Amino acid sequence: MQSIATSMKRITLDEGPISEVHAFWLAGMSCDGCSIAAVGAKNPSVDQLLKAAIPGLPKVILHHPVLSVTAGDEFIESYHKAKQGKLGAPYVVLYEGSVADESIAEKFGGYWSAMGTEESNDGTHQPIPTAKWLNDLAPEAAAVVAVGTCATWGGIPAAAGNVTNSMSVMDFLGKDYLSSLGLPPINIPGCAPVGDNLTETIASILMFLVGLGPLPEFDGLGRPAWLYKDTVHRLSLIHISEPTRLR
């Protein structure tokens, strides 16, 4: 994926340098374990990103259905603004869980996973599937990040014979998808993923956005190359051997 570097472009706003970046979290067929893992990140921590505590990096404004202090229409308003191009700041989309085929649920007048409502043709307000949010927000997102095994590869909800026809973010967006920066979906696998892997990836994207660093390198599976070049077992051996060397 390093070959896509030539198509990169930094997002600039008429108002001047980037001071904030919005992060829209969407939850599909998930257990919220990836959210818990993200909150446990330490280097950098979610708190550091939200408070712009890392020198040079813009403030991250997180919109999360579980962690947000707002609710209802007030919470969902920013999602609608991003969809309509009225946000006034760049944004990234983080998707947790596999993406269900909502056309199946629609046949029975329901949905698999939804957040917020919108007015339908008959004047009633109907739930908005998170798959639709992903479809609507992905085109103008600076990056789309698939968080966890379900989002990256499909996970348990996508097992053979499942009734939801669930799939990964990559499969849902299609092989030709590129973000507004020219990036294909970024994959942070793991059940649950290491929280630091997610926050460090976000920080690297922010550094590139503001011109403080190069385009992060991703491997052939869309994973941050510097984080996933070693296997979990090899990393475990490294951690186990360190105390022995210190003694």
Each predicted region: which residue ranges?
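Short, glycine/serine-rich, charged loops/turns that create anion-binding
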Residues: 30, 151, 247
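Extended, subdomain-level signal for the structured scaffold at the beginning of enzyme domains
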Residues: 4-134
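A residue-level signal for beta-strand positions that form part of recognition/binding surfaces
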Residues: 20, 185, 243
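FMN-binding flavodoxin-like domain, especially the glycine-rich phosphate-binding loop
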Residues: 134-236
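Conserved small/polar residues in nucleotide/adenosyl-binding loops
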Residues: 238-246
